[in-house]
Amino acid sequence: MQQLRDLHVLILGLGASGLAMARWCARHGAVVTVADTREAPPQLPTLQAECSGVRFVSGAFTASLVEGTPIRAVFRSPGLAPDVVAPVVDAARAAGLWQGGELSLFGAGLQDLQSRFGYSPQVLAITGTNGKTTVTSLTGQLVARAGKTVKVAGNIGPTLLDTLSDAMAQAEGDAQALEQQEREAEEAQAAEAARLVEEAAQAEAAAQAAAKAKPEEQAQAVAQESETTEPQHAEANEAPSEVAVAAEEEEAAPLLVQAPVRLSAMARVLPQVWVLELSSFQLDSSEGFEPTAATVLNVTQDHLDWHGTMKAYADAKAHIFGQKALMVLNRDDAAVMGMLPEPIRVKLQKPVVRAHVTFGGDMPQRPGDYGIEAVNGMTWLVRALEADETRKRRKDEEQELHIQRLMPADALRIRGRHNAVNALAALALASSAGCQLAPMLYGLREYRGEPHRVEPVAIVNEVEYFDDSKGTNVGATVAALLGLGADRRIVVILGGDGKGQDFSPLLAPVAQHVRAAVLIGRDAPRIRDSLQSCGVTLQDAADLQAAVQACAQLAQAGDAVLLSPACASLDMFRNYEHRAEVFRDAVAELADAAGVSMEGAL
């Protein structure tokens, strides 16, 4: 990247993203300073080992990191709260410096590859409070199943810039090999062409020699032919001659056929599609990032301690669409649909609507949109198509739709109506990248889901146990309850560190779908207060093992036991993975006692 060469760059924060930015900038010739409020962040030894020329400073983030220095660009790590970096960011803004984060550098990297090699991949970007890892992983799988080369990165890991660096390094070797193969093929073609020319020349020389050897025979044959031919008028003789000359001239005229644009070897070996999972933290500093298609799956309360307000949180999410991306919108979420800008109105012209596709749990009402249809007791994933694209409609005439049934929702391995909607989002994104439908539908059937996201664990005594330990906020748990509760009753485990959330949105789905709720952790009393009026059994448990035992007693045949705490885990566990491990171990004890295998879940 030419714009980084010799540029003095300041990177705020030395986490995984900060380290990736430092590597990237140093590799492209920047003079890099990394600042962190910690004296010895865990990534410091790696930074010092890999980027020996990078300067590290510790201490508070103050304007002095920028003012009076040669710094000309400031990139901040996504985990740093706005108020923490504000003094530096404000000083950088006042000085007119280049600002952004890892996403900005990723976008600049793609622009550089486009200008140097003509590389223009499809970039599919995904965010949302819940479901983004599932949709990101599934979209990547669908793109690959459709035969396109793809890289998946971002919040899902690994980092954007590390993945781009690895792809570029791999592509350089692949491009050299491809160029060598093409040179060898061209040389072989040239040799074959030369051989054919030589053979033709030899054949012509032989024919000329044969002709010189028998001049008398040729003259006699011509004389005989002249005697048998009737004389014709001069005008008649001239006409064919003129036609022949004209034909020769026309044949000799060059045909102006434009040669197809040939991409460079680098552009042909780099990934055709990028699928990126992006958090609100990353999107808060996404200046210069322009995907080709993007989605916000949903917006529910989360990370308000970081963003401050729901509006700031939603605004950060909306940055994902950039200025030109196809917007893939969830019809079921009013906050998401509110991100669609008003049509641009030009005098005497039809209003111009931003390009968008919608998906949702209801029937689609617009060509190109995706939805769910229930018919004759079966639920289908469907897409709306225009019934007759060739027929012109009157202004006041409603558009006639053809509903294309794609596959039964029961054919999905991932459970719940919310996951059927996630599948529709992935289909819409992958379709926008030019992926064919048939192989994608096979890919949907193959996808088994992500760990700890409504993941089936076992069936014990006709009760199915699900691990949704990744459900660390109220919105995730609401989605899980609505998804699983469509065809069964649920005994749910709730509780942990609520991060100051409002638990009242749980009230309606718990009342509708839950047989009993078992409460654990620091915020169990707050959850009990929010659910007191729902008419459902509420039972406290001292720990997760006791909660699983209680659920086994409360559940009835055909029910589901769901660990979906709606809370963070750090009050009782190392992380949500540790919480899931304890849950699975407790379910394994139940399975052992019942004499069944943990592989009993579908």
Which residues are covered by each model-predicted region?
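Short beta-strand "acidic-cap" motif of Rossmann-like dinucleotide-binding folds
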Residues: V31-D36, K151-V152, V275, T358, ...
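Residues in the short beta-alpha loop(s) of Rossmann-like NAD(P)-binding domains
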Residues: G15, R38-A40, I156, D333, ...
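Walker A (P-loop) phosphate-binding motif
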Residues: A108-P158
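Short, basic phosphate-binding NTP loop
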Residues: Q2-A125, D162, R445, R453-E455, ...
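Nucleotide phosphate-binding/pyrophosphate-handling subdomain across enzymes
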Residues: Q2-Q3, H8, M21-H28, Q404-V514
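Short internal beta-strands
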Residues: A30-R38, V328-R331, V491-L494, H513-R522
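C-terminal helical cap/extension that packs against the catalytic core
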Residues: L44-P45, S504-D559, M598-L602
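Acidic, Mg2+-coordinating active-site environments of NTP-dependent enzymes
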Residues: L47-Q48, E67-R76, L80-G101, G107, ...
